[in-house]
């Protein structure tokens, strides 16, 4: 099949539409503070998009690159389309923010500027300024002897226009840098938040004594945050990375956010020094630095304005009183997070660190929380003399510094730490424990779609798989040998790994379904679909009658509902949990269910070490089947992709199905039922039965 550029949706525009779906949660019947969270998430996402994707397009344009995507849009065309899209959507963001804050006021929760406070609260703000703000803020003069300062990425400041009271004709410009150690809002009372810049503005003349304030404007800068590291030339990769992190702070300016109706001379002053293209200047009639809205959303006095808190459940065959290794030795176990608890994953490593029969623990780490119990368990194991091998991916974007910290801590404890593979990121999520049983060695494995991160495990949907099967032991051992040693053979037998096998295996399974024509079925759930070869193979399958359902949270470059894709349906699910699992079903393959750390993107399939895991266990396959069925039935959180690249909400029928809420209810029902049943084998059977029935 010959493809053409018009058969693909532009990657960057597809991502923008994903983020629009995040913002669209503000239009739904959600608790107010949940809506505020979605605004924070939307703005955080946009920050990263500008730091990496827009910055990259600017570099391509500067280098004279004409085409950089499957749809053959040039970097300049993409930049123009992005700016147009975001300037239009800015008005929608402002609308939702004003609407939500207005509704919050009806609930007696306020964001108020200094000038709108009563005298008592103003006095409290004044006291807070002198005790907490004044000692740490940085007043900056800009003139012939004071050059324009370095502004960190995403730094928040107040630009000022002032004049000398003794010489009113001498207008000067400067700024007040607001350090990140200060909270975004001052909680002046239990229900009133004052933006920090509002207090600083009020006291600007005390910050610049002897000067009169003419105007001020809050602004925020975004820099290019991508890092290019010459790994092949690095003798000490950790040192090179630390240098790269320092250079990142000095990346080129790519965006300026500033309050609307700012003094024209202030805007000109900033533009002159930052040299930001005028279309990358965004003026807001609402507050800036909205990722910090989490501070308000976390107010303990207004939990009634949040969704009810769900507690993940641990289901059989896992049991508090049973060794996790005994459970895994009896059968393969699959859990779906965060509906089922992440605790067994932690217990897997914790128990291994304490078990005297365990001689080796191996693990990959990509994104780890700052206070990680899992990494602490690895440190304890290494300190006790166990052989601990940890692949810490130092190139995990925006987690580099945290990963550096843990890599050093593990190394100091005696663990063998691998920093990565030259030219690749290691994105696979896998751990292996080896125990002595008499004169034999027994292997236990955990493979996952998500990170070893207890914090994200509460808000990401992911799939974890525990097994002690020999074929998985063989392949995980080979995988860790590839990571720690030299190997030209990067192929496994049961597992598939990228960059050599996963794409090849996926294309092979698509071809099998294509050969079955209208009896073929493919269901694939992932974060993003970009790879043009896989998209072309799906088009060919569709034209042969294969029924294809794709559940893609984010980027999708495939165009559904065309002559060549009339049998392909694409949906995206956006809810309170971030859909992060990658689950694939190919009806006529054997096995036919897979989980993976990899999306169907060139970066995952060609430039990362990833794993795709076949699922053989019938109970686990039944769970995955139910999981996919629920998501394909969702008419509350789901959006459907149209052939013009736009997404439409799935029309609700009389029976509404929220796949995330339904799974919460299913697992809670199972848990409640099982609490009454003390027979372990019967309880496990009941858990499986309930998953199938529901």
From Swiss-Prot:
Post-translational events: An intermediate of this reaction is the autophosphorylated ppk in which a phosphate is covalently linked to a histidine residue through a N-P bond.
Binding-site list for Mg(2+): 367, 397
CDD domains for this protein: PLDc_PaPPK1_C1_like (cd09165), PLDc_PaPPK1_C2_like (cd09168)
Sites where the protein binds ATP: 45, 460, 553, 580
Recorded superkingdom: Bacteria
Keyword Iron part of the UniProt annotation: no
Keywords on record: ATP-binding, Kinase, Magnesium, Metal-binding, Nucleotide-binding, Phosphoprotein, Transferase
Gene Ontology terms, MF aspect: ATP binding; metal ion binding; polyphosphate kinase activity
Family in the record: Belongs to the polyphosphate kinase 1 (PPK1) family.
The protein's name: Polyphosphate kinase
Biological source species: Campylobacter jejuni subsp. doylei (strain ATCC BAA-1458 / RM4099 / 269.97)
């Amino acid at each position: 099949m010959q493809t053409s550029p018009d058969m693909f949706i532009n990657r960057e525009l597809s991502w923008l539409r994903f983020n629009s779906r995040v913002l669209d949660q503000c239009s739904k019947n959600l608790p107010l503070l949940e809506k505020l969270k979605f605004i924070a998430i939307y703005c955080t996402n946009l920050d990263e998009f500008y730091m990496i994707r827009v910055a990259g397009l600017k570099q391509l344009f500067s280098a004279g690159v004409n085409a950089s995507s499957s749809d053959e849009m040039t970097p300049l065309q993409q930049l123009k389309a992005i700016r147009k899209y975001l300037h239009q959507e800015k008005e929608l963001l402002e609308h939702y923010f004003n609407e939500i804050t207005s509704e919050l006021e009806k609930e007696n929760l306020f964001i108020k500027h200094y000038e709108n406070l009563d005298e008592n609260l103003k006095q409290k703000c004044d006291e807070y300024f002198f005790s907490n703000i004044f000692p740490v803020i940085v007043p900056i003069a800009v003139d012939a002897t004071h050059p324009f300062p370095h502004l960190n990425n995403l730094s928040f400041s107040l630009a000022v226009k002032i004049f000398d009271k003794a010489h009113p004709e001498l207008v000067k410009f400067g700024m007040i840098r607001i350090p990140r150690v200060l909270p975004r809002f001052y909680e002046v009372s239990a229900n009133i938040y004052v933006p920090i810049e509002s207090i600083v503005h009020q006291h600007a003349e005390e910050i610049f004594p002897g000067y009169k304030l003419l105007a001020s404007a809050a602004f925020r800068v975004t820099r290019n945050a991508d890092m290019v590291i010459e790994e092949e030339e690095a003798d000490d990769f950790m040192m090179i990375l630390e240098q790269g992190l320092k250079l990142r702070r000095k990346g080129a300016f790519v965006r300026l956010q500033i309050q609307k109706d700012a003094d024209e001379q202030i805007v000109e002053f900033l533009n002159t020094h930052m040299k930001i293209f005028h279309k990358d200047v965004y003026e807001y009639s609402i507050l800036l630095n909205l990722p910090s809205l989490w501070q308000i959303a976390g107010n303990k006095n207004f939990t009634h304005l949040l969704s009810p808190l769900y507690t993940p459940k641990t289901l059989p065959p896992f049991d508090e009183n049973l060794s996790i290794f005994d459970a895994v030795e009896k059968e393969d176990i699959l859990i779906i997070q965060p509906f089922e608890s992440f605790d067994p994953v932690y217990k897997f490593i914790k128990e291994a660190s304490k078990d005297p029969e365990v001689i080796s623990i191996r693990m990959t780490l990509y994104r780890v929380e700052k206070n990680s119990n899992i990494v602490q368990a690895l440190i304890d194991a290494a300190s006790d003399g166990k052989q601990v091998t940890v692949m810490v991916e130092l190139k995990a974007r925006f987690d580099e510094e945290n990963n550096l910290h843990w890599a050093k801590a593990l190394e100091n404890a005696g663990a063998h730490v691998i920093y990565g593979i030259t030219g690749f990121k290691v994105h696979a999520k896998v751990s292996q424990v080896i125990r002595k049983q008499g004169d034999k060695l027994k292997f236990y494995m955990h493979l996952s779609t998500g990170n070893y991160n207890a914090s994200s495990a509460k808000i990401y949907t992911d799939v974890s798989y525990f097994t002690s099967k020999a074929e998985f032991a063989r392949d995980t051992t080979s995988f860790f040998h590839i990571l720690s040693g030299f190997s030209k053979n990067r192929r496994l037998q049961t597992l598939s790994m990228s960059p050599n096998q996963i794409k090849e295996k996926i294309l092979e399974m698509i071809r099998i379904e294509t050969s079955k024509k209208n009896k073929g079925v493919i269901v694939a759930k992932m974060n993003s679909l970009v790879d043009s070869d896989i998209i072309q193979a799906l088009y060919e399958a569709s034209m042969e009658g294969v029924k294809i359902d794709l559940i893609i949270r984010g980027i999708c470059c495939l165009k559904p509902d065309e002559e060549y894709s009339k049998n392909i349906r694409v949906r995206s699910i956006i809810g309170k949990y971030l859909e992060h699992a990658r689950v694939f079903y190919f009806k006529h393959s054997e096995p036919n269910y897979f989980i993976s750390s990899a999306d169907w993107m060139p970066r995952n399939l060609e430039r990362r070490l990833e794993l795709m895991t076949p699922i053989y266990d019938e109970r686990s396959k039944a769970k995955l089947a139910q999981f996919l069925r629920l998501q394909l039935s969702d008419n509350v959180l789901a959006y459907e992709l149209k052939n013009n690249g736009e997404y439409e909400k799935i029309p609700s029928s009389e029976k509404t199905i929220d796949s995330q809420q339904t799974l919460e209810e299913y697992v809670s029902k199972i848990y409640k039922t099982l609490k009454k049943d003390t027979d372990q084998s019967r309880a496990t059977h009941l858990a499986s039965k309930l998953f199938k029935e529901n």
